[in-house]
Structures are given as C-alpha cells and as structure tokens.
Amino acid sequence: LEEVLKKTNVTQAELDAIVGAEVRQRGPLNWEWVQGILKAIDQHVPLSSGASIAIATKDVYQYLCNAAIANQINDGVMKAMQPGVPTVVVSHSLGTVVAYNLLKNKGSALGWEVPLFVTLGSPLAVTKIKQMITPIGHPACVKKWFNAMDERDIVALYPLSKKYFQVAPQIENKTDVQNPTENRHGISGYLGDPEVARRIHAALT
C-alpha cells in the first residue's frame, strides 16, 4: 500500500489530514493506517480509485466488471425474493452492492416489497463504485434503509450519508459499531451489535 501511495503523489499532509500523524507513525500494523491510505487514494487520485477497490474489495470489483459473475450472483438472489411478500433484506460487504443493484433496478418491476433494507460494512460510497452504479438513488421498493459501519472497517470507507451517497429519502446511518473481528469487517461483528440486531428483529416481528 505504501508503494501505491507513493505512485499517486498523495502528500504526507493529505494523508495526515485523514488518518492523523499518530496513526501514520504506527504504520501498517493497524487497520486505521490501511484505511487511511485507501481513503487518501480514493479522495485525491480519482483515476486510481479502482486500485483501492481491487486491494480491499476484490469480490466487489469482479461483480461490477464481470458480467458472467454478476449474472450468476444476481440469479441466486432473485430466486430468494417473492413478489408481493414483505421481505427484510440484510446485506453485508459485496452483498450490499448486489442487493442495492437488484432492488433499485428490478425491485419495483418484479413486485418486491422491502420494509427494511439493512446494509452492513458497505463499500457503496467508494468513488469508483458510485461511478459504476450511476445514477444512484433510493430503491423505490424499499421503505426504510438502515446502514451500519465500524469507522475502522477498510471496506466501508464512508457512511452512506448525504455527503458521500446522496439519495432521497436519506439513509439512516449508524457509524459507531465496534466490530470485534480482526479486520473490523466481519459480518458476525456487525450482527452482534445490539442496535443492529434490534433493528432487524423489530422489522421481522
């Protein structure tokens, strides 16, 4: 990652503004350092944003760039949805991209009804991903959208907030999850959060 950063001409000041000098000095043995470099590349070198996705979210990159892979994944998800049946959709990581893509582009036409759409550890707000799914918007078949992230998660670089992912109605964001998994991205760490679990349970009962 340091080599990638050097090639992008991102300055030390720009990196420090994102991660802070203390985190930078601790180096690559902490996730904040990794996340900071990915954010610096994403924010200051638009043409290199694809590289940051490939490093941190290879599966997402393949889904967006390989039609055969995308079609196979999409078909599996679509078989699980039933028209006219209220369905709570809980998604994580690549799954948030897949779910969003299908809900937005096919949900209404297929008669899907989603009272709650939950995205966990989502990379949807990463610049290159947004460019590849433009135009972005709130899926018409979704009544409420709840997004949760650990700010140290290297895949979920940004919240799905007005600043990074502007849709109407706005998405409710929870950014204080303390994901105990090694890379702060594991799904078990998100589902174990009391508020995340409460939201899902409430929507199902």
Regions found by a protein language model. Name each.
Residues 1-17:
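N-terminal accessory alpha/beta regions
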Residues 18-90, 96-205:
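Lipid deacylating catalytic domains
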